[in-house]
C-alpha cells in the first residue's frame, strides 16, 4: 500500500513538472491504446459507437462497431494501416473484405506535428482528489480536405479524450472512454485471411479516415 501511495505521489509530481515546464510540443500516444470510441454528428445523430485499438508505432487502427448500435442492419468493422495507405472494410459474418487506398493519412489518434496548442484546462474540479482531469487542446487545419480539427488529450499520458472535425461535407464529434494503454489481442491489426488477394478498389484522392463515419 505504501508503495502504491509513493508511486501516486511521484506520478503527481511528474505531472506537475510537465504542467510547469512543458514547451507545448505535441506529445505522442503510448505504443498501444484501446477503449471505446463514439462518433456523432454536430446535428446530434449517432454515427458509430464501438471498440477501438491503436498501435502508434506501426500507425495501425482497428474499430469494431457495437452490432446493436443505433439499430443498424450492418455495423462498421475497419482496419486502417495508415503508413501503407490501406483501408480494409471487414465483414466477418460473410467473410468478405473491401480494400481501398488511403491517400490522406492524418487522423485523430495522434496530434499532427503541425498542430497548434490552444489551451490547457481542467475538466471537473482541480482541488478535489480524483474529481478532475487536466487536458490540453490542440487544433489545426486539413487543407486537402477543406477542413479543420481540434483534439483534447490528457496532459499526463497523452491519451485521447475528445476530438472534432469540421469540413465542407460533414462535421464530426469524437469521444473516447475507458482508454487503456494496452491491446488484448494484437491480431486485431492483421487483416483476416479472406482479405488476401482482394484487389484494391478505386478511391478519390481525398478519401480519409473521416469518411468512415456517416449517416
Swiss-Prot record:
Tissue: EPDs are synthesized in the meninx and secreted in the cerebrospinal fluid.
Assigned keywords, A-Z: Calcium, Disulfide bond, Glycoprotein, Secreted, Signal
Location, primary (coarse class): secreted
SMART domains, alphabetized: EPEND (SM00026)
Keyword Glycoprotein: yes
GO annotation (BP), single: cell-matrix adhesion
Any single GO CC term annotated in Swiss-Prot or TrEMBL for this entry: extracellular region
Top-level division of the source organism's lineage: Eukaryota
GO molecular function: calcium ion binding
Span of the signal peptide: 1-20
InterPro entries (alphabetical): Ependymin (IPR001299), Ependymin_CS (IPR018224)
Cellular localisation: Secreted
Positions of glycan attachment: 71, 94
Post-translational modification remark: Different glycosylation variants are known as EPD-beta and EPD-gamma. Binds calcium through the terminal sialic acids.
Self-association and partners: Forms disulfide-linked dimers.
Family in the record: Belongs to the ependymin family.
Function of the molecule: May play a role in neural plasticity. May be involved during axon regeneration.
Protein name per the record: Ependymin-2
Organism listed in the record: Carassius auratus
Gene name in the database record: epd2
Amino acid at each position: 500500500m505504501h508503495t502504491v501511495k509513493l508511486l501516486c505521489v511521484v506520478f503527481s509530481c511528474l505531472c506537475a513538472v510537465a504542467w510547469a515546464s512543458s514547451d507545448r510540443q505535441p506529445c505522442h500516444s503510448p505504443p498501444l491504446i484501446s477503449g471505446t470510441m463514439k462518433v456523432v454528428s454536430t446535428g446530434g445523430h449517432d454515427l458509430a459507437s464501438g471498440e477501438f485499438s491503436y498501435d502508434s508505432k506501426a500507425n495501425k487502427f482497428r474499430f469494431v462497431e457495437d452490432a446493436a448500435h443505433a439499430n443498424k442492419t450492418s455495423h462498421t468493422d475497419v482496419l486502417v494501416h495508415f503508413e501503407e495507405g490501406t483501408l480494409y472494410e471487414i465483414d466477418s459474418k460473410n467473410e468478405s473484405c473491401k480494400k481501398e487506398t488511403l491517400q490522406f493519412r492524418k487522423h485523430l489518434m495522434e496530434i499532427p506535428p503541425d498542430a497548434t496548442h490552444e489551451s490547457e484546462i481542467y475538466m471537473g474540479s482541480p482541488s478535489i482528489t480524483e474529481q478532475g482531469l487536466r487536458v490540453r487542446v490542440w487544433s489545426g487545419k486539413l487543407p486537402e480536405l477543406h477542413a479543420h480539427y481540434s483534439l483534447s488529450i490528457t496532459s499526463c499520458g497523452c491519451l485521447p479524450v475528445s476530438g472534432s472535425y469540421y469540413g465542407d461535407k460533414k462535421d464530426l464529434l469524437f469521444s473516447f472512454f475507458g482508454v487503456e494503454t494496452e491491446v488484448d489481442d494484437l491480431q486485431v491489426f492483421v487483416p483476416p485471411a479472406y482479405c488476401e488477394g482482394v484487389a484494391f478498389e478505386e478511391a478519390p484522392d481525398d478519401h480519409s479516415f473521416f469518411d468512415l463515419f456517416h449517416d
